A protein has these predicted regions:
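Acidic, low-complexity intrinsically disordered tails
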Residues: 1-8, 637-679
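P-loop NTPase Walker
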Residues: 2-112, 116, 211, 293-296
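Conserved helicase NTPase motor core
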Residues: 11-22, 26-30, 41, 61-62, ...
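Short glycine-/polar-rich loops that comprise or flank the Walker A/P-loop
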Residues: 26, 55-59, 85-87, 121, ...
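Helicase P-loop NTPase motor core
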Residues: 30, 34-42, 275-277, 282-374, ...
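Short, polar/flexible loop-turn hinges at active-site or ligand-entry regions and domain interfaces
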Residues: 54-59, 79-88, 103-117, 128-140, ...
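Basic/charged alpha-beta structural segments of nucleotide/phosphate-handling enzymes
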Residues: 123-189, 207, 264, 372, ...
Length: 679
């Protein structure tokens, strides 16, 4: 492809890119803003050091965060060097160090043909360990796996008992980590965390191996440097020799994975630590000026950054202001997003809807379906396919139709009631020999006193609960029914009682989704109608479409770009999230602001920001303020079109309050807000 050949014509690089690529020796940090051509710089750098500085390409490490990026570099470099390189040193951290580990496996008591376990296998293994340690079944396998993963990322070994206990409050975590690790060695296997931690152990405990490797490696290139964690950064430093040929490309303003262990300090402190210069790439080839100025003015409110300002170098895209809309309710906001897309939609242009919380997706999905617009969710399941939603729906389905065996199996022991495989087998065998559904079979066993007292005490509350829900179906609103199931089943408590920090964050999102399920229920009169709606929504999505609208969280949007971008829900408590507001630390707020920067810079020319002044959650109307990030955008780049609706357009559904939208409370607050913040 033309682009690849160009990547080596140095005269096609802009001035800053060229300075970076032609850097001679020693460390360099390239601060590459959104859309400034960092892949081209990395590739050109690789080719430049081979062709011009005469480095051997087998002795260059190029680390990326995805296989896709690694393949892109290989492909472009192969083209430019006209020569097919199969270097073990180009790839992700995990692929590079897995090869290293196979060579030196015996240093950590493994054989070189060790297996890398996927998450299913890891779960099976930890389950054995938890049973062996007699840990209460209430705590799930993945909590322990996550915690062990975190310990590994923090360079804490199973034998560092005091460090483990200082870091984690999980019951018996020190013993479990230890036994889990022994089991891995016994079955000649590693998990993802081991690939890096074992390599770190080998390099720090065997001076000869470390020296051999650091002398062999002539140059190291790192992509997405702002996403590195402690362990990854330390591994790289162990492979550096005295020339310190380290070329890091990254953007501190796009560091949004702190919750996964990424350390923004790595990139912020790099220039001091290595006493080196910083090349800033600021010419952006993606977005128009209004968008870049907005992104720059928002992110400039962060104190902890190295600093740079982007400027637009794409003459082919229209200059237009950012569209700002305020709505009375989330319902109205979602309807507008779908309606606006349906007016602009065509096969040539791309559309992205980026939300802060997954719970925002449900009402948007709903409206996209109403408008028959093709969409897909990137980086996660659709709303009604999410685990927590399917779990709670299974209660409703079983209560609605007691012969629904699939739902019965899904929830009989969820939340855990101590009803194990054996007990479930008794119920199923009885159902087969008596031609009953699973739930009828359980009721039959209970009525005829055929269950052991201990099993009976565990299953009776479940029978009572399902009967109670069945009874309520025709007596109460669906909204109240949903709340009843979520609370009385113990499902909400199970999510709230989480001990593990990472899981807590995930569970907050699950709880938001359950509240959103209650909102969805409140829009229907009866349960059958609602369940049919769910079936149709899921069916509707099986058909794929060439140019579908992409719906995703801001985290999943990193690295993507769209002609048209919609950023709904810019309200305090949603964005910045309530979690960040509760922590009330500069650190968590700055991370949210970086997310805003990532969101804004995904758009080429059409950017639509919106917020609702009230959101209906869990039966209550919550009023909220516009996000502080809106007031950080200079008003010169914004156009508030909240009250300009296409009133004369009769064939589109009217917005609920289109008649009085000019005077809606949201509108009034927006005006006050904008007047107050006129820059």
């Amino acid at each position: 492809s033309n682009y690849i050949n160009q990547s080596m014509d140095l005269h096609l690089l802009n001035k800053e890119q060229k300075i970076a690529v032609e850097h001679q020796k020693g460390p360099l940090l390239v601060l590459s803003g959104a859309g400034t051509g960092k892949t081209r710089v990395l590739t050109s750098r690789f080719v430049y050091i081979v062709k011009n500085l005469k480095f051997d390409f087998n002795r260059i490490i190029a680390v990326t965060f995805t296989n896709k990026a690694a393949n892109e570099i290989k492909e472009r470099v192969n083209k430019a060097l006209e020569h097919n390189i199969e270097s073990p040193w180009i790839g992700t951290f995990h692929s590079i160090f897995a090869k290293f580990l196979r060579k030196h496996a015996h240093y950590v008591s493994l054989k070189s043909n060790f297996n890398i376990l996927d998450s299913e296998d890891q779960k099976k293994l930890i389950k054995q360990v938890l049973e062996y340690c007699k840990i209460d079944k209430e705590v799930s396998e993945s909590i322990y796996l996550n915690e062990i993963q975190n310990l590994k990322d923090e360079k804490i070994f199973p034998q560092d008992k005091s460090k483990i206990l200082k870091y984690s409050s999980l019951e018996n975590i020190d013993e479990i980590y230890n036994i889990y690790q022994q089991r891995l060695i016994e079955i000649n296997a590693v998990d993802f965390g081991d690939i890096l931690l074992h390599s770190y152990f080998i390099l720090t405990n065997n001076k000869d191996i470390q020296e051999t490797h650091s002398n062999f490696i002539q140059h190291i290139l790192i992509d997405e440097f702002q996403d590195t964690n402690l362990l990854q950064y330390d591994l790289i430093k162990l492979l550096l020799n005295n020339n310190q040929n380290l070329f890091c490309v990254g953007d501190d303003d796009q560091s949004i994975y702190a919750w996964r262990g990424a350390k923004i300090e790595n990139i912020i402190n790099f220039p001091n630590e290595f006493n080196c210069e910083v090349v800033r790439l600021t010419k952006n080839y993606r977005s128009n000026n209004a968008i870049l100025e907005a992104a720059s003015s928002v992110i400039s409110n962060n104190k902890n950054r190295l600093g740079k300002n982007l400027e637009s170098f794409n003459n082919e895209i229209p200059e237009q202001k950012i569209n700002l809309k305020s709505f009375y309710s989330q319902e109205e906001e979602s309807l507008w997003v779908a309606d606006n897309i349906s007016r602009k939609y065509n096969d040539q242009e791309t559309f992205g809807i980026l939300v802060r919380l997954t719970a925002q997706m449900r009402s948007i999905e709903d409206k996209l379906i109403k408008y028959a617009l093709p969409y897909e969710i990137i980086g996660g399941p659709r709303f009604f396919e999410r685990k927590e939603i399917k779990d709670v729906l299974s209660y409703l389905k079983l209560a609605n139709s007691q012969s629904d065996d699939l739902s019965f199996e899904r929830i009989i022991n969820l939340p855990r009631r101590g009803i194990g495989e054996q007990s479930i087998k008794i119920i199923i065998d009885h159902s087969r020999s008596n031609n009953l559904s699973f739930f009828e079979s359980l009721k039959d066993l209970a009525q005829s006193n055929k269950l052991s007292p201990s099993l009976s005490s565990k299953t009776q509350p479940f029978i009572d609960l399902i009967n109670k829900i069945s009874d309520l179906i025709n007596k109460t609103s669906l909204e109240d029914l949903g709340i009843f199931v979520i609370e009385e089943s113990g499902y909400l408590k199970m999510l709230e009682n989480e001990k593990n920090k990472l899981k807590q964050i995930e569970n907050e999102s699950r709880i938001d989704n359950l509240k959103e399920l209650v909102n969805a229920l409140s829009e229907f009169e009866n349960l059958d109608e609602f369940l049919e709606h769910v079936g149709l929504v899921n069916e509707n999505q099986k058909k794929t479409h060439q140019n579908s609208i992409k719906l995703m969280t801001l985290h999943a949007a990193k690295g993507l770009e769209f002609d048209h971008v919609y950023l709904p829900g810019w309200e305090e408590g949603i964005f910045p999230s309530s979690r960040a507001l509760e922590q009330n630390s500069t650190k968590s707020l700055e991370e949210e602001r970086r997310l805003a920067y990532v969101g804004i810079t995904r758009a080429k020319y059409d950017l639509n920001l919106s917020y609702a002044s009230s959101r209906y959650t869990y039966g209550i109307n919550n009023y909220s303020l516009p996000s502080r990030f809106l007031s950080e955008i200079k008003s010169i780049n914004l156009e508030d079109t909240s009250y300009i609706e296409n009133q004369n357009d009769t064939n589109k559904p009217k917005l609920l309050s289109s008649d009085n939208i000019a005077l809606s409370p949201g509108k009034k607050r927006m005006m006050e807000f904008l007047n107050k913040h006129k820059k």
